[in-house]
Amino acid sequence: MQRITYLGPEGTFSEAAMITLRTTGRIPGSSEVEPVSVASAREALVQVQAGDADYACVPIESSLEGPVVPTLDTLAVGAPLQIFAETVLPVSFTIAVRPGTAAGDVKTVAGFPIAAAQVREWLATNLPDAELVAANSNAAAAEDVKAERADAGVCTEWAAQRLGLHALASGVVDEAHAHTRFVLVGRPGPPPAATGADRTSVVLGLGNVPGALAAAMNEFAIRDIDLTRIESRPTRTGLGTYRFFLDCVGHIDDIAVGEALKGLHRRCEDVRYLGSWPRGTTAPTGANPPVLDEASGWLAETREGRLR
């Protein structure tokens, strides 16, 4: 049985993402899973690094708020980790209250910071005088309401139902079509086979020399590889020192992507490969890398003196 950590407690979007990955057969190995709820995305990943869990299911990107910083920072340091799968979930929230609570009774609202940011306008319009208090997760916000530590909570519908809370409002989100991307992370191993609709991710450490970032980007540009995400995060070793997170369309087994990764290894102080895996959405996301088999064949013939 495989042990999978996720940002808990029960009733979070992370749990829903883990269930989606399990029911769609995207968790490598045994289909028998032991879900383990933990208090943070960082803890979920650290347990995998320590060998106390086989995989972690954690959020990595919000369409409204961008990168999930604790996930990025933990992926970049410590024992190597690798992403094996992803899923994208539509996101909306329930504003949960204890039975009998009206909007006028709400003085405090518990919310996971990423979730609270996605309903900021709704709260300002409908609960303008309420104080926002931080919760460890969406489900923890519901538990804060149940325990009377807050009058209302920004949570998932199923977290509210599980605790017998009522919905002051349902389907709340400031922007329509909000989504969050979740990834399944394990210790390094062979990546899933290429599907033709894949994503590859790396973390780069660059030297403090002119043009270092441009040179790294050029490894993708000269091969017509589409970059879909570029993020920078401080290394925490001093001011002005950053590492860069890059996602591109394609798979390490694609010739163009493989050549780009070799180029990065030559140019960069450090390259941490985070994996190649099938994209979690069927919507087109960038252009696939070019097929270089013909070019490779031409080069082989030229080396043999068979000029065309």
Curated annotation (Swiss-Prot):
UniProt-listed CDD domains: ACT_CM-PDT (cd04905), PBP2_Aa-PDT_like (cd13632)
What InterPro entries does the entry give? ACT-like_dom_sf, ACT_dom, Chor_mutase/pphenate_deHydtase, Preph_deHydtase, Preph_deHydtase_CS
Q: Which domain of life is it from?
A: Bacteria
Q: Which gene encodes it?
A: pheA
EC numbers on record: 4.2.1.51
Domain ACT, chain residue ranges per copy: 201-278
Under NCBIfam families, the record lists: PRK11898.1
Keyword Amino-acid biosynthesis annotated = yes
Q: Where is this site: Essential for activity?
A: 180
PANTHER family in the record: PREPHENATE DEHYDRATASE P PROTEIN, PREPHENATE DEHYDRATASE-RELATED
Its quaternary structure? Homodimer.
Q: Which GO terms describe its biological process?
A: L-phenylalanine biosynthetic process
User: Which GO molecular function entries does the Swiss-Prot or TrEMBL record give?
Assistant: prephenate dehydratase activity; protein homodimerization activity
The record lists the catalysed reaction(s) as: prephenate + H(+) = 3-phenylpyruvate + CO2 + H2O
Biological or metabolic pathway of the protein: Amino-acid biosynthesis; L-phenylalanine biosynthesis; phenylpyruvate from prephenate: step 1/1
Which Pfam families does the protein's record reference? ACT, PDT
- The Prephenate dehydratase domain covers 3-187
Name of the protein in question: Prephenate dehydratase
* Gene Ontology terms: cellular component: cytoplasm
Alphabetical keyword list: Amino-acid biosynthesis, Aromatic amino acid biosynthesis, Lyase, Phenylalanine biosynthesis
